[in-house]
């Protein structure tokens, strides 16, 4: 393993076995960062490490694997102990792991066509407070409470658990960085619920507890089958709520830890499992955005939401 020095940087990437996470691991390691690639599926994680070593001539000096379930505190604790023992600190935490909260039903091609139409609206700068004219769930995907809960637990609470667990090790770094992978689908204009929008928009009074309150209220409304009457978005609902909450949480963190550089980012509409590989960008192109924020200088921005490499509105 690489010698522990003040110049060597150590990174943890969640969901690193495929897609944007995989390419982020590759790019960071190529820049001299020692990377811990994590995934819930141990077999897939080990296979990913072997592919990276073969494709990029990496060794254990550059990259290693550790199994991680971000919904399991014991699993997170095991990773914290590994990082503490091997490196003594952490410099970069990239919360990349995420799921869509829906399940494909029927013809995947139908879902792809729906996503392409919908995303063309989502990825515009038209802040009109509407859901692009989308009023009902389209064909091609279904959701239920289990999928919705898992989406929130993974995309929001998973990132939150990881952050809280690694703050002590990040505080030992001279250049601590946290990158939360969000989405333009988490923009407030698509959240629709006016109360939630007002809570998350008020950056001056925003707290972690208020973000949690929005998430819990959404889950309560979903359980009571009142999301439509309460004005929550009708499509990819849990995904939007989870990503909006993550962007808001990033703001709270940046205020709480002013010596850190903490940002959220939409890597663009990339070909990934989450969108049935309908994206227009490659995973590698998406990963560039994450790496850019992970390697910010100490006087770089913090608490912002980026679309790829540019600051965008929330």
Curated annotation (Swiss-Prot):
UniProt-listed Enzyme Commission number(s): 1.1.1.208
Keyword Oxidoreductase: yes
Active site: 239
A molecular function (GO) term: (+)-neomenthol dehydrogenase activity
GO BP of this protein: defense response
InterPro entries: CBR1-like (IPR045313), NAD(P)-bd_dom_sf (IPR036291), SDR_fam (IPR002347)
Record's note on what induces expression: Strongly induced by inoculation with an avirulent strain of pathogen, but not with a virulent strain. Induced by salicylic acid, ethylene, abscisic acid and drought. Not induced by cold, wounding or H(2)O(2).
Positions that bind substrate: 183
Keyword entries, A-Z: NADP, Oxidoreductase, Plant defense
Catalytic activity annotation: (+)-neomenthol + NADP(+) = (1R,4S)-menthone + NADPH + H(+)
Oligomeric form and interacting partners: Monomer.
Main function: Involved in basal resistance against pathogens.
Annotated family: Belongs to the short-chain dehydrogenases/reductases (SDR) family.
This protein's name: (+)-neomenthol dehydrogenase
Organism (species): Capsicum annuum
Lineage: Eukaryota, Viridiplantae, Streptophyta, Embryophyta, Tracheophyta
Encoding gene per record: MNR1
């Amino acid at each position: 393993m690489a010698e522990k020095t003040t110049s060597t940087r150590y990174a943890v990437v969640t969901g690193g076995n495929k897609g944007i996470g995989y390419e982020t691991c590759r790019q960071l390691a190529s820049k001299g960062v020692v990377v811990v690639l994590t995934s819930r599926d141990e077999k897939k994680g080990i296979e990913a490490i072997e592919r990276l070593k073969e494709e990029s001539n990496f060794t254990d000096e550059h990259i290693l694997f550790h199994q991680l379930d971000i919904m399991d505190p014991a699993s997170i604790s095991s990773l914290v102990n590994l990082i503490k023992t091997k490196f003594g600190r952490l410099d970069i935490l990239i919360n990349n792991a995420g799921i869509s909260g829906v399940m494909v039903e029927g013809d995947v091609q139908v879902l792809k066509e729906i996503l392409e139409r919908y995303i063309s609206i989502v990825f515009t700068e038209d802040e009109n407070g509407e859901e692009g004219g989308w009023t009902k769930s389209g064909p091609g995907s279904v959701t239920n409470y289990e999928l919705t809960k898992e989406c929130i637990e993974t995309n929001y609470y998973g990132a939150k658990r990881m952050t809280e667990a690694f703050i002590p090790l990040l505080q030992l770094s001279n250049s601590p960085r946290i990158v939360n992978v969000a989405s333009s689908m988490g923009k407030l204009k698509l959240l629709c619920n006016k109360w939630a929008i007002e809570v998350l928009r008020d950056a001056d009074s925003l707290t972690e507890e208020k973000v949690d309150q929005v998430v819990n209220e959404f889950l309560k409304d979903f359980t009571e089958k009142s999301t439509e009457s309460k004005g929550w978005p009708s499509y990819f609902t849990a995904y939007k709520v989870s990503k909006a909450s993550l962007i808001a949480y990033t703001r709270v963190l940046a205020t709480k830890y002013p010596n850190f550089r903490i940002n959220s980012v939409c890597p663009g509409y990339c070909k990934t499992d989450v969108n049935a590989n309908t994206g227009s960008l490659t995973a590698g192109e998406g990963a560039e955005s994450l790496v850019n924020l992970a390697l910010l200088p100490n006087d770089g921005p913090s608490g912002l939401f980026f679309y790829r490499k540019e600051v965008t509105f929330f």
